[in-house]
């Protein structure tokens, strides 16, 4: 018998990857506006557990951010 006050535990729904799907944006090193959404206010790449980006797309995203930094499109450090 279940207790009267017992509740189901809360399960947070897993977010889906923003780069998968029909009309998802393409990861491009020239799209600095898109890349800035995945860089913290200190200039670090935000981990996928926070942004819910899949592992494959996170590697692509990190590569694009690093390429944009090298070409001067994104800053390495934001002060």
Curated annotation (Swiss-Prot):
SUPFAM superfamilies recorded: Ribosomal protein S18 (SSF46911)
Pfam family, one: Ribosomal_S18
Post-translational modification: Both N-terminus methionine truncation and retention have been observed for this protein. May be methylated up to 6 times, on undetermined residues.
Any one of the GO CC terms: cytosolic small ribosomal subunit
GO terms of biological process kind: translation
Superkingdom field: Bacteria
Keywords associated with the record: Ribonucleoprotein, Ribosomal protein, RNA-binding, rRNA-binding
GO molecular function: small ribosomal subunit rRNA binding; structural constituent of ribosome
Annotated InterPro entries: Ribosomal_bS18 (IPR001648), Ribosomal_bS18_CS (IPR018275), Ribosomal_bS18_sf (IPR036870)
PANTHER family hit by this protein: 30S RIBOSOMAL PROTEIN S18 (PTHR13479), SMALL RIBOSOMAL SUBUNIT PROTEIN BS18M (PTHR13479:SF40)
Assembly, per entry: Part of the 30S ribosomal subunit. Forms a tight heterodimer with protein bS6.
Function of the protein: Binds as a heterodimer with protein bS6 to the central domain of the 16S rRNA, where it helps stabilize the platform of the 30S subunit.
Protein family per UniProt: Belongs to the bacterial ribosomal protein bS18 family.
Protein name, as recorded: Small ribosomal subunit protein bS18
Source organism of the structure: Rhodopseudomonas palustris (strain ATCC BAA-98 / CGA009)
